[in-house]
């Protein structure tokens, strides 16, 4: 396998082992997604601070972290139910701190996993309703600041992606070899708590002990022969203490700003889903005690089909939305937007906008990427269509979707950037207008902003001279066999046309995506094992790029009766686009189809 995928929903939580509770599903599979990353930081970032940290903890790694004195101030626990349910084992002190708990901050999912573990390992007696209340308190007052949570929102959004936040090879091999690095970065802890977390990993996972005790790949320059090399655990502890400590500037600034979420009203929603295109619509949020109910209407910009959903949601920490919604119509396909979905949205601290994912599927593989903007009566912009315009084009009609668009909108009120002239504007409704534009031959290529007065829709309209090449997304993908005992894990591929940008060179930073390309899809053998014929056994790829995996279990038709796992190239061939040789433009992605995930960690209760 030349590349790999990180399956964030199959990762253990930042507190260690995840334990199955009454309402959670926990599986971990041999097909957990991996990725091979180059080191992202030079070894120079690790310095003598590690040695100093060792001295500060009395030899640190020569002693048990459980014996280290806790030198940092804790965060007092002020919720009566949390004290009642947790305080028996987690002894309180005279400052209102509960042992362990007061020296950890985490996401709602992290606290939910910790509660499940206490039930399973320590016999905690707690009802589902009480657990939700404790999770809400801890996820708010012992949670993350918005700017701490945003870089790792892909964890609660259940996105499957290649992580870019791993700082060096040591932490890649010591932490992210088994779970997403976003898991530890979804919590903040004192140095002692990071040490105790390593202890728990070594106690519960045999392989973790081996990984943590190996020599670190990134050794500080202060370590010279014959000095003993630092272990991965030592380097990781120092890095996490410095970069994910309990007390941070972000938390100190956010803690006094936490307030009751006031989200009631109308929100403009725009979204995209691979293989399904773009959607615009409105969500109406109404208060329901401490929670909310929602009614959402979405319209496809490709087909015009309208979908209505209703649901509920709650907010942790004043900014972190968790919800669920359904359409009331039975889904016709696994990827049908009518399916019941869970919702994770990061809401801006000023509660004016949000961004996140509504997702479903056995592996959460289907999802709508959404942005939300509060409707206040002032103009709001959500999307434009078509997705791109070509240089030199004349009298092109561009539909603008938003809210509270002025009825007297004039050509001079709109700005599409340099080289684009607005000839006229027609307002069809407060939520849609049509602008007729000309694009100059020498208009700068790139993603242009669309502006209406002081309202800007950033990078909304690609201006391009031509589609220079294609990419298939996702570029690396993982599907799961299933259909007999376990559910299938599907995958949807899409071909996207790209521009080389201003420099005319492919693969540089100024390249930009333009729009989906009409293409057909087929599988091609990925040559790793002779005569394995993976294209025959792993599943079916339809011409639209939707992959359905085969069933799990031994297959007597395969050599050695192997399972139907395998790896292939997914090749997209454009129906009309040609390359410079006059041949149909092509691109390919890498697909691994593996066995079911037999154990999985999930916290659906945080959305209830």
PLM-predicted stretches and their roles:
Residues 249, 340-342, 346-383, 587-597:
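Edge beta-strand at a domain terminus
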Residues 179-180, 257, 261-350, 355-358:
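Central antiparallel beta-sheet cores of small beta-barrel/beta-sandwich binding domains
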Residues 392-454, 515-517, 535-536, 543-546, ...:
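Immunoglobulin-like IPT/TIG beta-sandwich domains and homologous Ig-like subdomains
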Residues 91-121, 180-206, 308-310, 314-315:
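Gly/Gly-Pro-rich "capping" loops immediately C-terminal to redox-active cysteine motifs
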Residues 373-413, 455-508, 604-605:
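Beta-strand/beta-sandwich contexts
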Residues 54-82, 122-123, 130, 145-169, ...:
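Electrostatic cytochrome c docking/interface patches
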């Amino acid at each position: 396998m030349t590349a790999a995928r990180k399956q964030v929903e199959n990762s253990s939580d930042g507190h260690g082992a995840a334990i199955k509770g009454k309402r959670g599903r926990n599986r971990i599979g041999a097909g957990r997604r991996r990725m091979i990353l180059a080191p992202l930081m030079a070894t120079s970032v690790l310095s003598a601070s590690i040695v100093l940290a060792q001295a500060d903890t009395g030899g640190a790694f020569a002693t048990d972290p459980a014996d280290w004195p806790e030198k940092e101030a804790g965060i007092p626990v002020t919720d009566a139910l949390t004290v009642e349910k947790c305080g028996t084992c987690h002894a309180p002190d005279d400052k209102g701190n509960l042992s362990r708990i007061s020296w950890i901050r985490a996401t709602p999912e992290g606290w939910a996993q910790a509660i499940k573990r206490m039930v399973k390992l320590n016999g905690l007696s707690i009802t589902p309703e009480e657990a939700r209340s404790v999770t809400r308190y801890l996820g708010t007052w012992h949670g993350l600041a918005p700017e701490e949570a945003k870089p790792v929102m892909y964890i609660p959004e259940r996105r499957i992606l290649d992580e870019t936040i791993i700082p060096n090879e040591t932490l890649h091999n010591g932490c992210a070899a088994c779970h997403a690095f976003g898991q530890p970065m979804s919590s903040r802890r004192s140095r002692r708590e990071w040490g105790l977390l390593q202890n728990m990993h070594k106690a519960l996972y045999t392989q973790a002990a081996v990984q943590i005790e190996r020599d670190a790949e990134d050794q500080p320059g202060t370590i010279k022969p014959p000095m003993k090399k630092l272990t991965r655990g030592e380097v990781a502890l120092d890095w996490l203490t410095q970069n994910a400590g309990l007390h941070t500037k972000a938390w100190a600034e956010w803690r006094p700003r936490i307030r009751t979420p006031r989200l009631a009203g109308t929100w403009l929603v725009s979204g995209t889903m691979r293989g399904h295109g773009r959607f615009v619509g409105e969500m109406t949020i109404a208060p329901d005690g401490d929670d909310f109910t929602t009614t959402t209407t979405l319209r496809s910009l490709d087909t015009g089909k309208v979908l209505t959903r209703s649901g509920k949601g709650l907010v942790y920490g004043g900014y972190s939305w968790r919800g669920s919604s359904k359409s009331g119509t039975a889904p016709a396909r696994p990827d049908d937007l009518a399916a019941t979905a869970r919702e994770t949205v990061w809401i801006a601290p000023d509660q004016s906008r949000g961004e996140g994912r509504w997702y479903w599927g056995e592996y959460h593989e289907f999802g709508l990427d959404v942005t939300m903007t509060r409707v206040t009566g002032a103009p709001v912009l959500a999307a434009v269509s078509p997705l791109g315009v070509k240089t030199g084009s004349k009298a092109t009609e561009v539909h603008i979707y938003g809210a509270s668009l002025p009825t007297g909108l004039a050509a001079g009120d709109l700005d599409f950037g340099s080289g684009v002239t607005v000839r006229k504007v027609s307002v069809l409704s407060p939520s849609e207008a049509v602008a007729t534009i000309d694009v100059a031959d020498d208009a700068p290529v790139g993603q242009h902003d669309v502006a209406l007065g002081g309202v800007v829709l950033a990078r909304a309209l690609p201006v391009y001279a031509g589609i220079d090449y294609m990419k298939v997304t996702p570029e690396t993908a993982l599907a799961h066999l299933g259909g007999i005992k376990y559910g299938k894990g599907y995958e949807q591929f899409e071909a996207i046309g790209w521009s080389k940008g201003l420099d005319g060179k492919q693969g540089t930073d100024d390249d930009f995506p333009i729009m989906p390309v009409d293409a057909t899809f087929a599988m091609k053998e990925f040559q790793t094992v002779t005569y394995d014929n993976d294209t025959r056994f792993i599943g079916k790829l339809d011409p639209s790029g939707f992959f359905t995996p085969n069933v799990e279990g031994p297959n007597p038709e395969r050599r050695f009766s192997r399972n139907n796992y395998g790896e292939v190239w997914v090749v997209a061939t454009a129906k009309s686009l040609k390359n410079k040789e006059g041949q149909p433009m092509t691109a390919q992605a890498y697909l691994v189809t593996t066995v079911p995930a037999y154990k999985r960690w999930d916290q659906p209760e945080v959305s209830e």
